[in-house]
A protein has these predicted regions:
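Active-site neighborhoods and metal-handling regions in enzymes and metal-associated proteins
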Residues: 1-250
């Protein structure tokens, strides 16, 4: 069932989204050569809890981390580890959900470790641009298919692909709510967007094919061809004045 949130509730989701965005801004500055993904995870948890929030990923269906930290060919759900040390030229996606006063915000960025190569840099740029192409379609009267079509159509000319097995979602008082928001679709198809809906649009884009493998830990998802992937996400409120991004970073 799709939940329609009141303007007061959306402000509470926005507060959670602000803490989510602030946490990502802090983490982006902390990303450097030689740091482990577990160190980033610990920094995120401390930051979130010190501001009255809860890192919702921690313990979710048994996930051990406060963030998902996915490096290079890991597309999503990378478990933070003391053994995963960032190297120059790596790319890392940092995905997190924050609960604040009973409401949730969800966002993800993919950033380079220092300078990365041109192919990786283009992948990051195109993935973020595809996110905003999808966001432009998040208006009352459009459909979920309009969003997915915009995302996929944006990345295809670069030879990239989008994951089919993992999608965006509604959000609010739960981390994952209806409707699902795929990164592919047919214009005019799928659930119709209404004012008061809150959704997460999150392109998961592969440099090569979208075939994936789940790691033995049961969480990390890597590209089958070993090529890099990128992941960007915002929490969006559907309003009569256009899409409102609730997780914008300063």
């Amino acid at each position: 069932m799709i939940t329609i949130y009141t303007s007061e509730e959306i402000e509470k989701i926005a507060a959670a989204g602000k803490l989510t965005a602030d946490t990502l801004s802090m983490l982006e500055k902390a990303v450097r050569l030689g740091i482990s993904t577990l160190e980033l995870d610990e920094m995120a948890e401390k930051f979130i809890r010190s501001r009255g929030g809860i890192p919702s990923c921690k313990g979710y269906e048994g996930f051990p981390g406060s963030i998902c930290a996915s490096v290079n060919d890991t597309v999503v759900h990378g478990i933070p580890s003391a053994r995963k040390i960032l190297k120059k030229g790596d790319i890392i996606s940092l995905d997190l959900v924050v609960e604040l006063n009973g409401y949730m915000g969800d966002s993800c960025i993919t950033v380079p470790v220092g300078h990365t190569n041109k192919k990786n840099a283009q992948l990051l740029k195109v993935t973020e641009e595809a996110l905003f192409a999808g966001i432009k379609q998040a208006v009352p009267g459009n459909t979920v298919g309009d969003i997915g079509h915009a995302v996929e159509s944006y990345v295809r000319p670069y030879g990239y692909d989008v994951l089919r097995d993992y999608v965006g979602h509604g959000i609010g008082i739960e981390m994952h709510e209806d409707p699902e928001i795929p990164n592919y679709g047919t214009p005019g198809h799928g659930p119709r967007l209404e004012e008061g809906m809150v959704i997460c649009i999150e392109p998961m884009v592969t440099m090569g094919r979208a075939d994936i493998i789940t790691l033995r830990d049961g969480w990390g998802v890597v590209t089958a061809d070993g090529l890099p992937a990128a992941h960007c996400e915002h929490t969006i409120a559907i309003t009569g004045n256009g899409p409102r991004i609730l997780t914008l970073r300063d």
